[in-house]
Swiss-Prot record:
Gene name as annotated: dxr
Gene Ontology MF terms: 1-deoxy-D-xylulose-5-phosphate reductoisomerase activity; manganese ion binding; NADPH binding
Keywords: Isoprene biosynthesis, Manganese, Metal-binding, NADP, Oxidoreductase
NCBIfam families reported for this sequence: Dxr
First-tier enzyme category under EC: oxidoreductase
Pathway(s) where this gene product acts: Isoprenoid biosynthesis; isopentenyl diphosphate biosynthesis via DXP pathway; isopentenyl diphosphate from 1-deoxy-D-xylulose 5-phosphate: step 1/6
Protein name: 1-deoxy-D-xylulose 5-phosphate reductoisomerase
Cofactors required: Mg(2+); Mn(2+)
Family statement: Belongs to the DXR family.
Role according to the record: Catalyzes the NADPH-dependent rearrangement and reduction of 1-deoxy-D-xylulose-5-phosphate (DXP) to 2-C-methyl-D-erythritol 4-phosphate (MEP).
Binding site for 1-deoxy-D-xylulose 5-phosphate: K116, S142, E143, S166, H189, S202, N207, K208, E211
Organism: Malacoplasma penetrans (strain HF-2)
Length: 377
């Protein structure tokens, strides 16, 4: 057998961090259908779902910071060392995912990146690390995945990158109608099947704020435009200098983006439903930046390049979502908490990882103190 044939038949080894979450769990179907090998996974405390994964993939090594189970190792680092994967799927939610992104880059492992917060809080640091790493980063967000796919063989001069957003469940509501939104309503996304945190981020537009910053770091441009597109069929577009466009379209199903990320955009397997053009109606509208402040905050960052701002936004947002779920604050209070945190901490100097970690910690403390005093819970 020729060497090339050996490589052809070799199973791709996949390590999934955050396997019991929405993205991580969805990846298991792709791993099975693509005939990859799940060599290991991590989870936090969803033991019931983890047990299901263990039964499906009995040879996979496991790490959990809170639960000991079959084939357990003691740390993220040990899990990576013992599995020696070809690619890591970072499907952790929030700031905690930064550690995994840095771990992949430092160990020269390819990365399917669903954890956008890594780039939001430390995009400049990740850019520095990538210069000395052989890792390739494949974005798993549907917008960035589709842009990556459209750009990879393109040689035309680009005028603008366009990403779309559904607007979440409240986009068409008047501002005063947002006053009494509850958590259960906010997690009901009209088009996508997503986890709780990202569903709230979609409802507040923080998700799109973060995706603008993510696109800036991934594609090295400030020329990023967002349009509300209620059908979630067109995920992204590229506008060229001759005013022609390329649009990337599919039914809203995250399996496609996960599949592209894990395969390095090489897979030919069909895992999602085809798009029907019968009675297809596509609508777009400009975002009201006064109503949806997070989009405005993202554009401000692109202009002022204050490294502290995205770290503050992310930490304050994560803490505010917890307070909202606990019914200690209202939906619109999320915006006030983030804005107050930005004003209080935006002059913090950020030059290295230690600064990122300290500002993340200090922002969370600020939110706790401010909210306790303001909302009297």
């Amino acid at each position: 057998m020729l060497e090339g044939e050996k490589m052809e038949n070799k199973k791709k080894k996949v390590l999934v961090f955050g396997a019991t979450g929405n993205i991580g769990f969805s990846s298991l179907e792709i791993i099975e259908k693509e005939n990859y090998e799940l060599v290991g996974f991590s989870f936090n405390n969803n033991y019931e779902k983890a047990l299901e994964i263990i039964n499906r993939f009995p040879n996979a090594l496991v790490f959990s910071p809170s639960v000991k189970t079959k084939n357990t190792v003691n740390s993220f680092e040990e899990l990576l060392e013992k599995t020696n994967p070809d690619i890591i799927l970072n499907a952790l939610v929030g700031f905690s995912g930064l550690h995994i992104t840095l771990l992949a880059l430092k160990n020269n492992v390819d990365l399917a990146l669903a954890n956008k917060e890594s780039l939001v809080v430390a995009g400049w640091l990740i850019e520095d690390l990538k210069r000395s790493s052989s890792s390739r980063i494949y974005p798993v967000d549907s917008e960035h995945s589709s842009l990556y796919d459209s750009l990879k063989n393109n040689n035309k001069e680009i005028k603008e990158l366009i990403i779309t957003c559904s607007g979440g469940p409240f986009y068409k509501k008047e501002f005063n109608e947002l006053l009494n939104i509850n958590f259960a309503d906010a997690v009901k996304h009209p088009n996508w099947n997503m986890g709780k945190k990202i569903s709230i981020d979609s409802a507040t537009m923080m998700n799109k704020c973060f995706e603008i910053i993510e696109a800036y770091y991934l594609f090295n441009t400030k020329k990023i435009k967002v349009y509300q597109h209620g059908q979630s069929i067109i995920h992204s577009m590229i506008k060229f200098t001759d005013n022609s466009y390329i649009a990337n379209m599919s039914v809203p199903d995250m399996k496609l983006s996960i599949q592209q990320g894990l395969s390095g955009y090489e897979s030919k397997t069909n895992l999602i439903n085809d798009l029907s053009f019968n009675n297809l109606n596509l609508t777009f509208s400009e975002i009201d930046l006064d109503k949806w402040k997070p989009i405005h905050w993202a554009y401000d960052f692109l202009e002022n390049q204050n490294r502290a701002i995205p770290i503050i936004m992310n930490a304050a947002n994560e803490e505010a979502i917890v307070l909202f779920e606990e019914n200690k604050i209202k939906f619109l209070d999320i915006f006030e908490i983030i804005e107050k945190a930005i004003i209080a901490l935006e002059n913090t100097e950020v030059n290295d990882l230690k600064d990122i970690l300290n500002l993340n910690k200090n922002t969370r403390k600020y939110v706790y103190d401010f909210s306790k005093n303001k909302f009297r819970y």
